[in-house]
A protein has these predicted regions:
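Short, surface-exposed coil-to-beta transition loops
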Residues: 68-74, 95-101, 193-199, 219-223
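Acidic/charged, solvent-exposed loop-and-adjacent secondary-structure segments enriched in E/D, K/R, S/T
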Residues: 110-155
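N-terminal leader/targeting segments and the immediate start of mature chains
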Residues: 2-81, 236, 240-248
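Gly/Pro-enriched, hydrophobic low-complexity segments
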Residues: 177-241
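N-terminal beta-strand/beta-hairpin edge segment
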Residues: 70-115
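Generic short beta-strand segments
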Residues: 56-63, 90-92, 184-190
Length: 248
Protein backbone atom coordinates (compact mmCIF):
# COMPACT_ATOMS: atom_id res chain seq x y z
CA UNK A 1 0.00 0.00 0.00
CA UNK A 2 2.79 2.39 0.88
CA UNK A 3 4.50 1.75 -2.48
CA UNK A 4 1.25 2.55 -4.29
CA UNK A 5 0.81 5.74 -2.26
CA UNK A 6 4.38 6.77 -3.02
CA UNK A 7 3.89 6.22 -6.74
CA UNK A 8 0.62 8.17 -6.63
CA UNK A 9 2.31 11.00 -4.77
CA UNK A 10 5.10 11.23 -7.34
CA UNK A 11 2.62 11.19 -10.21
CA UNK A 12 0.56 13.96 -8.66
CA UNK A 13 3.56 16.09 -7.86
CA UNK A 14 4.48 15.99 -11.53
CA UNK A 15 1.68 18.41 -12.42
CA UNK A 16 3.10 21.18 -14.60
CA UNK A 17 2.27 24.76 -13.80
CA UNK A 18 2.08 25.32 -17.55
CA UNK A 19 -1.37 23.72 -17.33
CA UNK A 20 -2.61 26.46 -15.04
CA UNK A 21 -6.12 27.51 -16.21
CA UNK A 22 -8.81 29.91 -14.89
CA UNK A 23 -12.00 30.51 -12.96
CA UNK A 24 -12.81 33.01 -10.19
CA UNK A 25 -15.70 34.67 -8.43
CA UNK A 26 -17.33 37.36 -10.58
CA UNK A 27 -18.59 40.24 -8.49
CA UNK A 28 -20.10 43.42 -9.86
CA UNK A 29 -18.96 46.99 -9.32
CA UNK A 30 -17.77 50.07 -11.14
CA UNK A 31 -14.39 50.66 -12.71
CA UNK A 32 -12.83 51.64 -16.02
CA UNK A 33 -11.27 49.08 -18.33
CA UNK A 34 -9.35 51.75 -20.24
CA UNK A 35 -6.19 51.22 -18.20
CA UNK A 36 -6.10 47.42 -18.32
CA UNK A 37 -2.78 47.44 -20.26
CA UNK A 38 -1.17 49.79 -17.74
CA UNK A 39 -2.57 47.86 -14.78
CA UNK A 40 -1.21 44.63 -16.23
CA UNK A 41 2.25 46.05 -16.87
CA UNK A 42 2.54 47.46 -13.34
CA UNK A 43 1.25 44.28 -11.69
CA UNK A 44 3.48 42.00 -13.75
CA UNK A 45 6.55 44.09 -12.94
CA UNK A 46 5.81 43.86 -9.20
CA UNK A 47 5.62 40.07 -9.45
CA UNK A 48 8.85 39.94 -11.44
CA UNK A 49 10.61 41.96 -8.73
CA UNK A 50 9.19 40.13 -5.68
CA UNK A 51 11.81 38.24 -3.65
CA UNK A 52 9.23 35.82 -2.24
CA UNK A 53 5.63 34.94 -3.05
CA UNK A 54 2.81 32.51 -2.39
CA UNK A 55 0.80 31.07 -5.30
CA UNK A 56 -2.43 29.08 -4.83
CA UNK A 57 -3.75 27.51 -8.02
CA UNK A 58 -7.32 26.20 -8.17
CA UNK A 59 -7.89 23.91 -11.15
CA UNK A 60 -11.07 23.03 -13.00
CA UNK A 61 -10.34 20.57 -15.79
CA UNK A 62 -12.70 19.21 -18.43
CA UNK A 63 -9.92 17.58 -20.42
CA UNK A 64 -9.25 13.81 -20.29
CA UNK A 65 -6.87 13.06 -17.42
CA UNK A 66 -5.38 9.91 -19.01
CA UNK A 67 -5.53 8.24 -15.63
CA UNK A 68 -3.66 11.02 -13.83
CA UNK A 69 -5.26 12.62 -10.81
CA UNK A 70 -5.64 16.38 -11.15
CA UNK A 71 -5.49 18.29 -7.84
CA UNK A 72 -8.25 20.67 -6.84
CA UNK A 73 -5.62 23.12 -5.65
CA UNK A 74 -1.85 23.56 -5.48
CA UNK A 75 -0.31 25.87 -2.85
CA UNK A 76 3.38 26.77 -3.15
CA UNK A 77 5.37 29.48 -1.42
CA UNK A 78 8.90 30.55 -0.61
CA UNK A 79 11.74 32.86 -1.60
CA UNK A 80 12.49 33.08 -5.31
CA UNK A 81 16.18 32.28 -4.73
CA UNK A 82 15.10 28.66 -4.23
CA UNK A 83 16.71 28.32 -0.81
CA UNK A 84 13.47 26.91 0.59
CA UNK A 85 9.94 26.13 -0.56
CA UNK A 86 6.62 24.79 0.69
CA UNK A 87 4.30 22.75 -1.55
CA UNK A 88 0.82 21.36 -0.82
CA UNK A 89 -1.52 19.82 -3.38
CA UNK A 90 -5.08 18.93 -2.36
CA UNK A 91 -7.40 16.33 -3.89
CA UNK A 92 -11.04 15.85 -2.86
CA UNK A 93 -12.89 12.70 -3.86
CA UNK A 94 -15.47 10.32 -2.34
CA UNK A 95 -15.62 12.22 0.94
CA UNK A 96 -11.86 12.19 1.41
CA UNK A 97 -9.36 15.07 1.37
CA UNK A 98 -5.88 13.99 0.29
CA UNK A 99 -2.83 16.20 0.76
CA UNK A 100 0.57 15.76 -0.82
CA UNK A 101 2.99 17.96 1.13
CA UNK A 102 6.63 18.88 0.62
CA UNK A 103 9.05 21.27 2.28
CA UNK A 104 12.57 22.13 1.22
CA UNK A 105 14.66 23.49 4.06
CA UNK A 106 18.44 23.79 4.45
CA UNK A 107 19.25 21.31 1.69
CA UNK A 108 16.75 18.70 2.89
CA UNK A 109 13.47 17.75 1.20
CA UNK A 110 10.67 16.65 3.53
CA UNK A 111 7.54 15.00 2.14
CA UNK A 112 4.46 13.22 3.39
CA UNK A 113 1.04 12.04 2.27
CA UNK A 114 -2.14 12.48 4.36
CA UNK A 115 -5.82 11.59 3.96
CA UNK A 116 -8.69 13.10 5.98
CA UNK A 117 -12.43 12.48 6.07
CA UNK A 118 -14.31 15.53 4.84
CA UNK A 119 -16.89 16.83 7.30
CA UNK A 120 -15.39 14.95 10.25
CA UNK A 121 -13.61 16.50 13.21
CA UNK A 122 -11.36 15.52 16.07
CA UNK A 123 -10.16 11.93 16.21
CA UNK A 124 -12.59 10.91 13.45
CA UNK A 125 -11.01 13.25 10.87
CA UNK A 126 -7.63 11.63 10.05
CA UNK A 127 -7.90 8.55 7.84
CA UNK A 128 -4.22 8.17 7.06
CA UNK A 129 -1.22 10.19 8.20
CA UNK A 130 2.34 9.19 7.44
CA UNK A 131 5.48 10.59 8.99
CA UNK A 132 7.57 13.02 7.04
CA UNK A 133 10.42 11.46 5.10
CA UNK A 134 13.67 13.40 4.79
CA UNK A 135 16.05 13.13 1.84
CA UNK A 136 18.93 15.30 0.63
CA UNK A 137 17.72 17.95 -1.80
CA UNK A 138 20.16 17.73 -4.68
CA UNK A 139 18.22 19.50 -7.43
CA UNK A 140 19.29 22.88 -8.75
CA UNK A 141 17.06 25.39 -6.88
CA UNK A 142 17.23 27.70 -9.88
CA UNK A 143 15.50 25.01 -11.95
CA UNK A 144 13.04 23.62 -9.42
CA UNK A 145 12.62 26.26 -6.71
CA UNK A 146 10.08 29.03 -6.23
CA UNK A 147 11.85 31.28 -8.71
CA UNK A 148 11.39 28.65 -11.41
CA UNK A 149 7.71 28.38 -10.54
CA UNK A 150 7.24 32.14 -10.84
CA UNK A 151 9.18 32.18 -14.12
CA UNK A 152 6.98 29.37 -15.47
CA UNK A 153 3.86 31.31 -14.58
CA UNK A 154 5.18 34.55 -16.08
CA UNK A 155 6.25 32.71 -19.23
CA UNK A 156 2.68 31.53 -19.78
CA UNK A 157 1.28 35.07 -19.43
CA UNK A 158 1.44 38.11 -21.73
CA UNK A 159 4.62 40.14 -21.41
CA UNK A 160 4.63 43.83 -20.50
CA UNK A 161 2.95 45.65 -23.35
CA UNK A 162 1.17 42.46 -24.37
CA UNK A 163 -2.27 43.92 -23.65
CA UNK A 164 -1.74 47.28 -25.34
CA UNK A 165 -4.28 46.61 -28.09
CA UNK A 166 -6.66 44.49 -26.02
CA UNK A 167 -10.12 45.62 -24.90
CA UNK A 168 -11.21 44.72 -21.37
CA UNK A 169 -14.17 45.17 -19.04
CA UNK A 170 -13.42 46.18 -15.45
CA UNK A 171 -15.39 45.48 -12.28
CA UNK A 172 -14.80 46.71 -8.74
CA UNK A 173 -14.79 43.69 -6.43
CA UNK A 174 -13.59 42.48 -3.02
CA UNK A 175 -10.74 40.02 -3.32
CA UNK A 176 -8.41 38.64 -0.66
CA UNK A 177 -10.04 40.95 1.88
CA UNK A 178 -9.42 44.17 -0.02
CA UNK A 179 -10.88 46.42 -2.69
CA UNK A 180 -9.75 45.29 -6.12
CA UNK A 181 -10.38 45.65 -9.84
CA UNK A 182 -10.98 42.60 -12.00
CA UNK A 183 -10.22 43.04 -15.70
CA UNK A 184 -11.92 40.59 -18.08
CA UNK A 185 -10.32 40.51 -21.52
CA UNK A 186 -12.58 40.56 -24.57
CA UNK A 187 -10.37 37.88 -26.09
CA UNK A 188 -7.89 35.50 -24.40
CA UNK A 189 -4.26 36.53 -24.87
CA UNK A 190 -1.35 34.07 -24.91
CA UNK A 191 2.15 34.65 -23.63
CA UNK A 192 5.48 33.41 -25.02
CA UNK A 193 4.60 29.84 -24.03
CA UNK A 194 1.90 28.77 -26.47
CA UNK A 195 -1.09 26.81 -25.23
CA UNK A 196 -1.96 28.96 -22.21
CA UNK A 197 -4.09 32.11 -22.55
CA UNK A 198 -4.91 34.87 -20.06
CA UNK A 199 -8.64 35.55 -19.78
CA UNK A 200 -8.81 37.87 -16.75
CA UNK A 201 -6.72 39.32 -13.93
CA UNK A 202 -7.32 41.14 -10.66
CA UNK A 203 -5.22 43.87 -9.05
CA UNK A 204 -5.34 45.63 -5.71
CA UNK A 205 -7.10 48.98 -5.92
CA UNK A 206 -4.71 50.38 -3.30
CA UNK A 207 -1.30 49.60 -4.77
CA UNK A 208 -1.91 47.76 -8.05
CA UNK A 209 -0.46 44.45 -6.85
CA UNK A 210 -1.44 41.39 -8.85
CA UNK A 211 -3.96 39.37 -6.84
CA UNK A 212 -5.18 36.77 -9.33
CA UNK A 213 -4.64 35.62 -12.89
CA UNK A 214 -7.18 33.52 -14.77
CA UNK A 215 -6.14 31.41 -17.73
CA UNK A 216 -7.37 28.58 -19.91
CA UNK A 217 -5.45 25.77 -21.54
CA UNK A 218 -6.63 22.63 -23.36
CA UNK A 219 -9.88 22.30 -21.44
CA UNK A 220 -8.36 23.31 -18.11
CA UNK A 221 -9.43 26.44 -16.25
CA UNK A 222 -8.15 27.78 -12.96
CA UNK A 223 -7.43 30.84 -10.93
CA UNK A 224 -3.98 31.56 -9.51
CA UNK A 225 -4.11 33.67 -6.35
CA UNK A 226 -0.90 35.52 -5.48
CA UNK A 227 -0.16 36.86 -2.02
CA UNK A 228 2.56 37.57 0.54
CA UNK A 229 4.85 39.16 -2.06
CA UNK A 230 8.07 39.85 -0.21
CA UNK A 231 6.41 38.72 3.02
CA UNK A 232 6.46 34.91 2.96
CA UNK A 233 7.33 33.50 6.39
CA UNK A 234 10.49 31.36 6.48
CA UNK A 235 9.77 27.72 5.66
CA UNK A 236 10.28 25.57 8.75
CA UNK A 237 11.35 21.93 8.92
CA UNK A 238 8.76 19.59 10.49
CA UNK A 239 9.16 18.78 14.21
CA UNK A 240 11.77 16.06 14.73
CA UNK A 241 9.25 13.65 16.28
CA UNK A 242 7.15 13.80 13.08
CA UNK A 243 10.04 12.80 10.81
CA UNK A 244 10.65 9.12 10.03
CA UNK A 245 14.01 8.03 11.38
CA UNK A 246 16.35 6.66 8.74
CA UNK A 247 17.99 3.26 9.24
CA UNK A 248 21.57 3.46 10.33
Amino acid sequence: MRQCQTQTRRTRRGLSLAAVGAAALLLTGCASGDDAPGAWDRARTQLEEADSVRMVTELRSEAPSNGRAVPDSVDISGPVDGSSMRYVSVYQDDGLITRDESRIVDGTAYSRFTVERAGASGEDRPAYVERWTATPYESDPRATGMGAMVSSLLGSLPESGGLDDVEADADGIRRSGQDAIRYVLDEPVSGPQEGVALTAFTVSKEDGRLLTVETESAGTKAVVTLSEMGEVDPVQAPPADEVLKQDG
